[in-house]
Amino acid sequence: MAPFRSIYEKDATKKLVVGAALLVLAAFYSYVFLLTLAPVYGSTPSHIFHGYGVGIAGVAGWFSKDIVDRVSGRKAIYAIPVLAFFLPVVQYFVSQQSSALGNPAGPIFTEVLALYPLVLLSVACAGKLVQAGLNLQRHGDLVAEHIPLLGSYVIYSAGEHLIKAFLSRFIGSTVLLSRAGLQILIAIFYAAAVPSKALLLAIPAFLFSVTSNTHLPLGHTTTALNNIIADDGFALVARQDSTTGYISVLDNLEDGFRVMRCDHSLLGGQWIKKRPNYTPPAVKDPIYAVFTMLEAVRLVETAHGIPRADAGSNALVIGLGIGTTPGALISHGIDTTIVEIDPVVHKYALQYFDLPENHTPIIEDARAFVQRSRNAPQPKQYDYIVHDVFTGGAEPVELFTYEFISGLHALLKDDGVIAINYAGDISLYSTALSIRTIKSIFPTCRLFREAAAPEIGPDFTNMVIFCTKSRGAPITFRDPVPEDFLGSRFRSRYLVPKHEVDAAQFDNVGLEDGPQGHGRRVLVDKEVGRLHKYQDRSALEHWGIMRTVLPDRVWEGW
């Protein structure tokens, strides 16, 4: 193979192509590495310091490029493909210490150990190649240094946009386009850009990745993963990378429940254990009471006092999860439309959680659907709307803005009812802001939490907000009848909301004088970025809670 010196001394086009390739591949790997952290640490916590760290590594690489070139004898570029092959191996073993490392220390430590050196070397070597290829010394040192710097930044940024756009459509479609598969694929591209005999050193890492890395969704690696988590009483039923995260279905073989996982969170679960003399309900019981509480949207009495018949009623459900709530609505004979952004979530709900097929699925971003629907010449309106969106440990704040909730208001019939599930720390400003936004649009609301408030510690909970358009009549629930329970003892206990929360307690949170004051009364689209720090805190709390729900090895093995 040609040594680096000969590559460096070839024509300008060759230098620029290899330099640009290194920058683009570094951008690819940076984004993919972030995706691979999400199943272990959650998507939001993994983002907290990622951008800063990659930026520092890139800047350090650029300004140390001459030192790297001199100290390595122009051989540093050989190490880049080898390092790229070893990154999944390092990450695999470090992820097994995630509980000890904690969050957000775990993502930081993993990236410092693996990703940042790759970014630093890629930028350093690419910088030398781009400078040599452009050969702007005749225009002075200022031009010779800054034009390649700006050009490198543009190329890297273009790589980021390219990989995000590509994966938004194709992630998970093949093994090589899974998260772990992409790490191997990018390493192969690195090797193609910089071929050398040093690649022989990467053979052990490559062999480990394709034979023993349980993160790679192959038949034998899945079997190995099941052997590992079997000691904790779990079995992997299905898994696939998708647009919203790493989606998997897991069975708890001891307690008898099945869950759907999205990254480091659960979209829901249901009991599957069959007991003697037990008649299963029409819709399987969920493991979380909040999904049954959402079904109470049917129990809200109309302002005119006439009971609403299920037959002839229709419902719009924003966010599917495993399909507990929409499944119940369908079982009651309600014409149900489900809007779900992730096609794999919808597929798994049908295949593994008995979601009835007699519904209207809309696989689309809810914001686009609501905007298009409300702007239609004759917008379709619904008797019931259920807003239940939660992935990765943090609420998608874009679906709690004044604009989005106003869109749902336009799609709700005048005597209709909306139920909104909000999961988060009830003490945070972001929670109060979301509640105030909802109340500013719907004049009559009642709030209920899933369980009683804890005496000490963080107050992370699921909360359901029931609202109507009526300004006069308060929200009341009719007494349930046996048919409402769908043959379920669980529903007979949890269908009717019990733990009411005084909505007034959120009226002034964040609006007071002082360091925590001067907040906004409602959330609008252009200001969603103001809530990121609150999302970070809520996601970190959620991570700790999730570690008590499933064993560490289940989260780490993915």
UniProtKB/Swiss-Prot annotation:
Entry keyword annotation includes GTP-binding: no
Presence of keyword Membrane: yes
Subcellular location, record wording: Endoplasmic reticulum membrane
Lipid bilayer topology: Multi-pass membrane protein
InterPro entries to which the protein is assigned, alphabetical: Lys/N-term_MeTrsfase_sf, SAM-dependent_MTases_sf
Reactions performed catalytically: L-histidyl-[protein] + S-adenosyl-L-methionine = N(tele)-methyl-L-histidyl-[protein] + S-adenosyl-L-homocysteine + H(+)
UniProt effect for mutating residue 340 to A: Abolishes catalytic activity
Disruption phenotype: Abolished N-terminal histidine methylation on the lytic polysaccharide monooxygenases (LPMOs).
Enzyme Commission identifier(s): 2.1.1.85
Residue intervals annotated with topology Lumenal: 33-49, 97-104, 170-172, 216-558
Molecular function (Gene Ontology), one example: methyltransferase activity
Transmembrane segments annotated in the record for this chain: 16-32, 50-65, 78-96, 105-131, 146-169, 173-194, 198-215
Example GO BP: methylation
Cytoplasmic side, ranges: 1-15, 66-77, 132-145, 195-197
Job description of the protein: Protein-histidine N-methyltransferase that specifically mediates 3-methylhistidine (tele-methylhistidine) methylation at 'His-1', which protects the side-chain from oxidative damage. Methylates lytic polysaccharide monooxygenases (LPMOs) destined for secretion, including AN4702.
Family as reported in the entry's similarity comment: Belongs to the methyltransferase superfamily.
PANTHER family with a match to the protein in the record: METHYLTRANSFERASE DOMAIN-CONTAINING PROTEIN-RELATED (PTHR12176:SF59), SAM-DEPENDENT METHYLTRANSFERASE SUPERFAMILY PROTEIN (PTHR12176)
Domain notes: Contains an N-terminal seven-transmembrane domain with little structural similarities compared to known membrane proteins and which is required for the NHMTs specific activity in the context of N-terminal histidine methylation of secreted LPMOs.
Entry protein name: N-terminal histidine N-methyltransferase
Gene: nhmT
